[in-house]
Amino acid sequence: SMQRGGRVLYTAGEHPAVAAPCESLKGTFDVQQIPYDAAGVVRLDALEELLTPDTRLICVMQVNNESGAVMPLCEIAQLRDRLCPQAMLHVDGVQGFMRLSVDMRALGIDSYALSGHKIHGPKGIGALVMGPRMRVAARMLGGGQEKALRSGTENTPGIAGLLAAIEAYPRDNNMRAVKLHLYERLREIAGENFRLNGPDPASDIAAPHILNCSLVPVRSETMLYALEGDRVYVANGSACSSRKQKLSPVLSAMNVPRRQAESAIRFSICPYTTMEQVDFAADCIARHYEMLKRYERR
């Protein structure tokens, strides 16, 4: 809960689970978007301009779910501490949890959200980790469970499943190596028509498990349907809005050209993805791309 008035900031590529609640505060708060650069990373210069003494809340994702860009949480926290230390910092860690480390206490993060289904846990279970400054209102009233913050019988199997998933998640894995191998294969397949949508996959500002690229001129939905026949499943944009045939707001925030955005495909790697599986997927893509590029409109 926050006092009325003041500024609320969220990044241009936030998940709708964060963006929509922020937008709902318009009229009560001055709600502003923090822009991205071409790699999909928060522009710190723009954030510095947007931070005002009356800023109440800053929402930023640890890793963008479409581009795989890693946000500079340390620098964001430092700007907050210098310009508006009273502002709450909320981090959506759904795509970063167990893949990247984060120290809430050291950075002064006030709340951190995570979800079980992104680490092979059950769907419908997650956690909101709150720091000592955070005060939240009850989500629902009734029996007073969860310290009276969320009444209702706890989802005990889900909670146990989340813990089991955390304990079982392989800390030592080769996700980045597998992703880089896929990246090189796709570059070979599309040649000069290959476009990367996000940061350099080998860099520290790229998550180890997400690769977004365009194989121009083949439209993403055409390639998706072709690959389904091979039981290779990739995504165009966010999996949460896969039925909406419109350009990705994330790619739009990165100023990706329309034709390139229409060909964008997102690949997700997990600790159990093998080089052999990636090679199989790349072989299927190569076969379909060679045929489909002849028929796609120019």
Each model region followed by its residue ranges:
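Pyridoxal 5′-phosphate
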Residues: 1-298
